[in-house]
Regions:
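Cross-family detector of peptidyl-prolyl cis-trans isomerase
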Residues: 2-6, 22-204
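C-terminal motif of bacterial Sec signal peptides marking the signal peptidase cleavage site
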Residues: 17-21
């Protein structure tokens, strides 16, 4: 076999390896998101059970969607679609006043899918108060699950991990950024740094 034929054979072999590698990667990526809705529903149900088992004494809380908070419990209230789960990682300081729906807040946050894929953030890795950046936005401008959590935070420096079902997140449609699939349970690590109400900022 001459050198020219050897060169062609080598190129064919490399092409086959590359194609096989791409195919394997695609399969792995696709399989992770197979039955995504069912997997996310199960994941939130498990977190809800854990929160109830651990209890508020251990820093776990279950809160109803802010828009349903004052409504009586009826058969139309779906526990797995109308609640968020909160794990208090650290309690902050200050008064028991809390942000309102029309207030602006200053937060550090990291948004993740159930598999810990980070789709939005203003800090990376473990939260470090000396390094994390902050963002300002109005409470009513975020998804219901995020807004519900913010309106339950009563201390500057409250540091929570918040779990929300897709119904209180981005719903049954894929996000426009293409990074959040439809029916995604979301996890947000949130640190409340302050909020703006009645014409003034409340900060630590």
């Amino acid at each position: 076999m001459n050198l020219k034929n050897l060169k062609y054979l080598f190129l064919l072999m490399m092409s086959a390896i590359v194609l096989a590698s791409c195919s394997e990667t695609d399969e792995n990526t696709d399989s992770e998101y197979d039955d995504w809705q069912a997997k996310n529903k199960t994941a939130f149900a498990e977190i809800l059970v854990k929160a109830k088992q651990e209890g508020e004494a251990n820093g776990w809380h279950v809160y109803r969607n802010w828009s349903m908070e004052n409504q009586p419990v009826t058969p139309t209230v779906n526990e797995q679609e109308d609640n968020i789960v909160v794990q208090v990682m650290q309690q902050g300081e200050g008064s028991a006043v809390r942000p309102l729906y029309t207030d602006s807040v200053m937060v550090s946050y990291k948004g993740m899918l159930k598999n810990d894929y980070v789709f939005d953030h203003n800090f990376t890795g473990d939260y470090d108060v000396n390094k994390a950046q902050t963002s300002n936005f109005i409470v009513k401008g975020v998804v219901d699950g995020f807004a519900t959590a913010l309106m339950k935070m009563t201390h500057i420096g409250d540091h929570w991990m918040v779990y929300m079902p897709y119904t209180l997140g981005y719903g049954s449609s894929q996000s426009s950024s293409l990074t959040i699939p439809a029916y995604s349970m979301l996890k947000f690590e949130i640190v409340l740094k302050g909020w703006y109400t009645d014409g003034k900022w409340i900060k630590k």
